[in-house]
């Protein structure tokens, strides 16, 4: 399908504005690309609840787990450049990882949330990278790797960051800046420089409301000792949304949940992936790496979310039994949402890159109507 920028904007803009009028959006931005070209951007609202700071072209915002998609892209590029297949064992490159019965865990299992490492037995702080890595190394899988999958909310970023460090000799944050962000002028950071805090929108927690679906997940999330509670609180710390508005925490390289940037940057990155791995006259990914992004590795009931989810090599896909598509109608679409409403993906079949970011979170584990109505309208 070929999108026409003018007619698409006429269809999308009223829905975008309706997010503020009907759905309680505070500030937000949207960016849609096709075939490596930007079709249009939209932005509106405010960076703060006092409504004193308008959301402008240079506003950036925390996107929580949408950062995982960026991190996964960096890992897959690292594997591509070093000719490493994802069926290789993690312990080949990270020997201490093999402790606790993990010697045969593959990269594919690790990046598809099926390694059974979503929670840690050792009580370590999320800000202490080395302590978290040591705890990961000692951790025994919580289920037989490859037999099931469950969302690795916090540990995922540490797992892929350490593997990139072992193979490429640098952190994902630095790899991202060098390989993608600087060459493509992408306004997205994993570890925000202090001088950019003045451009940041404040992120606000979801308003108190009756728990939305999946009800069982939300009930288990607040129950001590459950897998859900352990997953979202280990490694521990920075569980309050407000903590991530502090400059010292924005500066931390949290690959699982700390990325800060613009909708335009996210959409352009996914537009590159959707466009055969190339954009602006540069090619970043070959066919083999792109196939890893579109090919489902794990699909079915997620042990953490307790609903069907699916993952390729680090990217989320629509589950076969999902109640609603998150990434449009194409089976080849992939991406990663963020807590509360941010959403970004690539549709390689139609060469589309999409991103929606916001600062007023909603109580939802997956993208909500504010972004999904826009996705649906894009394919009318």
Language model: regions and residue ranges:
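Short, gly/Ser/Thr-rich active-site loops of penicillin-recognizing serine hydrolases
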Residues: 254, 275, 289, 294-301, ...
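Active-site Gly/Thr loop motif
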Residues: 202-258, 263, 291, 295-349
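Active-site helix/loop module of the DD-peptidase/beta-lactamase fold
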Residues: 57, 62-66, 80-122, 138, ...
């Amino acid at each position: 399908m070929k999108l026409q920028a003018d007619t698409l904007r006429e269809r999308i803009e009223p829905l975008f504005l309706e997010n503020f009028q009907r759905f309680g959006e505070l500030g937000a931005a949207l960016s849609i690309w096709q075939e490596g070209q930007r079709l249009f951007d939209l932005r509106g609202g405010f960076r703060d609840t006092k409504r004193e700071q308008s959301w402008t072209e240079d506003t950036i915002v925390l996107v929580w787990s949408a950062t995982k998609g960026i991190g996964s892209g960096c890992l897959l590029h690292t594997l591509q450049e070093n000719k490493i297949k994802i069926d290789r064992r993690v312990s080949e490159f990270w020997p201490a990882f093999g402790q606790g019965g993990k010697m045969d865990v593959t990269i594919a299992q690790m990046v598809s949330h099926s390694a059974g490492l979503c929670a840690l037995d050792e009580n370590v702080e999320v800000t202490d990278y080395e302590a978290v890595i040591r705890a990961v190394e000692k951790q025994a899988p919580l289920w037989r790797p490859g037999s099931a999958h469950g969302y690795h909310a916090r540990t995922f970023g540490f797992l892929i960051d350490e593997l990139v460090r072992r193979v490429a000799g640098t952190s994902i944050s630095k790899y991202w800046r060098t390989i993608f962000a600087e060459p493509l002028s992408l306004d997205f950071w994993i570890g925000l420089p202090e001088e950019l805090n003045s451009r940041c929108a404040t992120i606000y927690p979801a308003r108190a409301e009756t728990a939305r679906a999946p009800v069982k997940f939300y009930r288990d999330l607040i129950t001590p000792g459950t897998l859900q509670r352990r997953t979202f609180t280990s490694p521990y710390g920075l569980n309050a949304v407000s903590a991530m508005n502090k400059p010292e925490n924005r500066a931390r390289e949290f690959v699982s949940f700390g990325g800060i940037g613009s909708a335009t940057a996210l959409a352009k990155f996914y537009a590159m992936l959707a466009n055969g791995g190339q954009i602006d006259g540069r090619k970043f990914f070959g066919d083999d790496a792109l196939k890893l992004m579109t090919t489902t590795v794990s699909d079915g009931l997620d042990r953490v979310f307790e609903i069907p989810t699916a993952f390729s090599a680090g990217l989320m896909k629509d589950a076969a039994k999902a109640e609603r598509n998150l990434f449009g109608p194409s089976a080849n679409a992939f991406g990663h949402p963020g807590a509360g409403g941010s959403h970004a993906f690539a549709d390689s079949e139609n060469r589309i890159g999409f991103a929606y970011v916001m600062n007023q979170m909603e109580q939802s584990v997956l993208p909500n109507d504010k972004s999904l109505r826009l996705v649906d309208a894009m394919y009318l």
